[in-house]
């Protein structure tokens, strides 16, 4: 299994997925991994399915579909792959969900009533600051591409301003690490109302950094609808008087 793909997948799950634990009627614990995307991005779910060779795609409604890895597939296919490559989730919520799953596997706990109140952290990496993430998480760039597929935006506004943004609720250290990947001229925006952080770039020199990252660096590529969005975004930049002198990838 391609480790770059797995790192990309971890980033996508951190953004648009969750590990769901439920108590069955007989008291046993069941875990499912769910990734939900817009139906226009069904191709991304199909791509992941083709790489993992496990999982099921279900239509939620007229807008969304989901890829589900059920209990056995999650525990005995995906988890061993992640552990063998030292891949861990980076957002607080997903890390907590994964810790619970790992605890039940390590201690062979099958019934809900046997779960302790406190679950240990299984990630061996400690992040006290954004530099820790950049230096210790060797798969961070592949992870970031996955998170962009989930939560990033390549946008062209009506006033012809063109930019790139990515945001998350909470996870301040993680967002600061993303900021340091590009070191843009605009500071991180924080919404007190939504408790969310946003890295947003529109300056010419910052847009060049974005192009360099997604077109010229060697990491996992964008896929699906986000790739289509990026290519359309590049076309918009080429037609813009402000941005057309940037260095672009060859067609």
Give the positions of each predicted feature.
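Internal intein/HINT superfamily modules and their associated LAGLIDADG
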Residues: 1-251
